[in-house]
A protein has these predicted regions:
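Terminal, non-globular segments
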Residues: 1-170
Length: 170
């Protein structure tokens, strides 16, 4: 129950840091995507129902702070979450942080793919500007670099006393 309560606070804190602090400190092409790290963690963790609810919450937070069209990041984040869950059925997603960093890179590639394909399908391409590869690659490298200490933090949170799995999960 503790994990279900602390993860929404972490999601809100990461969204706030990403929208308010990092956007003021770093240039646009180097901003790490902190929500993608949390979604990758939730996708690689055994939480399914609570993980999907938290990813839904993360999508709503991202849309609130970014001003994107309604439902875009919500759909992208849920797609990435379920893609990682599906990938976990075929591959063994262990506790190795290096594997989770690779999953962050794959998630960012899937996010770029969906953000390139969805706006024309939804008819909102005139409202969006798509960055080039010279913006995407530094952001992906920075996100993978920031992901390392965040995954260590998430691992420490799992070992806290009183952290027990949710009764909704098998």
């Amino acid at each position: 129950m503790f994990r279900f309560l602390i993860l929404p606070f972490i999601a809100f804190f990461l969204a706030l840091i990403q929208a308010a602090v990092i956007s003021e400190i770093m240039p646009n092409f180097v901003k790490p995507d902190l929500m993608m790290i949390l979604i990758t963690y939730l996708g690689a963790s055994p939480l399914l129902i609570t993980g999907a609810i938290l990813v839904f919450f993360c999508g709503l937070l991202q849309e609130t702070f970014s001003g994107s069209p309604h439902g875009l990041f919500l759909f992208v984040y849920l797609s990435i979450f379920f893609f990682i869950k599906l990938l976990g059925k075929f591959l063994i997603l262990g506790e190795a942080i290096t594997l989770r960093i690779v999953l962050v890179a794959v998630s960012l590639a899937l996010q770029v793919f969906l953000l390139v394909l969805l706006p024309p399908a939804l008819g909102i391409l005139s409202n969006l500007s798509l960055p080039g590869l010279d913006w995407i690659l530094p952001q992906a490298l920075m996100t993978c670099g920031v992901g390392w200490p965040l995954f260590l933090l998430f691992k420490k949170l799992e070992t806290l006393p009183g952290v027990e799995p949710s009764p909704l999960e098998p």
